[in-house]
Amino acid sequence: MTMITIDYIKDIIKRSDKLSEEIDPDQTPYKSKYEAIELLVKELKKEINENEKELNQQQQQDILDYLVVIDSKLGELFIATEEITLGLNICRDCLKSLESIKNKFPLETISTFQSIAIIDINKNHFENGKQLLIKSENLINQTIEKQQEQEQEQEQQFKDKLESLQLQNYFYFAQLYGLLKDSELSSKYCELTLRKQLKRNNFDRLEWCKNSLMLAEYYLSELNFDYAKQCFLVSNYICKGIENEDDREETQANIYLVMAKFYLEFLHFFRDIENLNHCHRVNNNNKNNNNENDIDFVQGGLSSISLSDKQKEKEKEDKLFNENQIKKEKMLDLISFNKRSLNIDKPLFTELGSELLDKIYNHSTFTSPIDLIVVKDQPSARDIFLKSQHFFNKSKKYYKLDGFVSQHIKILFDQINLFEYLNMFESNAGRKIGIHKKKIELIQPLLKELNPTYFLSSIRSIYFKIAEIYSEISKIYQCVCTNLREIQTYNECLFKSMEYYNLFLNSYNDGEVPNSPKITEEEKMKSIIEDFEVYINAKLELAVCHKNVKGVNKLVLEHLEKSLNLFRSIITLLDSVPKDISSRHTQEYHLCSQMSSLLPQKIQFLSSNKTPNPGQWYGK
């Protein structure tokens, strides 16, 4: 019989730990872990039970403490071999005892906290998982602090294991807060994970780049362009060390995508600033162009605008201008780019060393500098636009339509947004229309390529977007309609918009889209409710398009009647859906009710004997 000693127990546990870390072939994936279990159960626990009576009281207490540790390790081994219920029960059973000796066995206690926490998180027991991770984090910090205070010379193996557990805790926290939709805390722990991995210099480069690019996107959402830039530049450096060529190419394409979005979101921000300026300019133009008398299309008479009404209107415009100025100031306070304090004094990823960081940030491999300028006019907007477009096009070389349909379409829609942001800074009507047509050219060819059986949702998005673009073009032509030819061009844009809105709406009907799957009436209503926001907007926009048609009375009347029917159908639809859905669309309901009341009067007015002859053009 072997005389049981603490050193003997430690030796068996060390052998078991070594076995548990072995990576076995796919045919026998858990061979080493089962050997570790056998070592702990058959050899160690058996020896302890046989020698228990020969030990003094202190030895017995020490052995009991180690039995708790052995049980916790067994629980983790069973979890690792996918016997999760058994392993979880063992870990939970020994957790209370383990917490009582946590100062003696901090690493084992932390590891058990984490094992239970990640299972709870995977089962959506987020609060339980969160509390265990907090306990784990506190114990990690206490252990590090204790080491520093007492200047303990711990084994390197202990320090490495503690750092590894700290890294794992950061990673689990990042996952947890991601699932809880707390992007701020998730990003905080993601950053800590990335930095700890760089410090340890032992990490999967592919996963590191993925997480770093996710962090970059978070910083873009927070308008922190300086930190976003640091994330993708360091990812670009790390990416070069990915050994697998396919993985490296995919990661490089994702880096280009984030860089494209870097410029896209920057232009988006200044588009919003310009939009506030534009609102004020439009109000001023309207004020200057207002006539004192306005024609009422129903009564056919004149209505005077009193001085008090003008004063109220001016006060309203002044108030709006002041509100917009405050909004602009707040927005400009939020944005961060080209700030020395973030790029020099507080850079991310200092673990790489200042010399290497300087090389990465200031001497990157890209042909042109990755910099930003304040967007004030069309030339500066175009500069940002071209840089974003450049990186979108580079990413599309990897994310081709053949093989990456969803991602390719997503990139095209991002490019459409890019064109839209540029258009805000364009003052020439012809160039504005040209930009809109470029947007259509990007996505219209996809309608011939996509199979509705698999990509019906994408096809609907394309229908809706093209309809929206033609509607925007019609608004530009509407401002310059002075003769028959211009009115005809204006109407053609409206008719194109109607065509695509109808294609979108009809796609919810069985058999309307070629090769689309058959659906029942119940399935149709379900799909409408799933897309209710965009569906109701499409119907509303279609009704407005019909209402805005210009030309001879016969044509106008025909489209006014269609418009009226659509407004009424929207009311019927909103009355038929559940209350929680209809309550979100009270504004649309009110507008449709107003139109259902006003349009019959307009139709009657145009049809009455007072109207000009049938060949008369109506452009009101």
Swiss-Prot record:
Taking the record's annotation, the residue ranges forming a coiled coil are: 30-64, 133-169
Q: Which UniProt keywords apply?
A: Coiled coil, Cytoplasm, Cytoskeleton
A GO biological-process term:
mitochondrion transport along microtubule
Subcellular location(s) per record: Cytoplasm, Cytoskeleton
Its protein name is KIF-binding protein
- Which Gene Ontology cellular component annotation is one that this UniProt entry carries? cytoskeleton
What the record says about family reads:
Belongs to the KIF-binding protein family.
Q: List the disulfide bonds.
A: none
- Do you know which PANTHER family this protein is assigned to? KIF-BINDING PROTEIN (PTHR46321:SF1), KIF1-BINDING PROTEIN (PTHR46321)
As given in the record, the signal peptide range reads none
User: What's this chain's function?
Assistant: Activator of KIF1B plus-end-directed microtubule motor activity. Required for organization of axonal microtubules, and axonal outgrowth and maintenance during peripheral and central nervous system development.
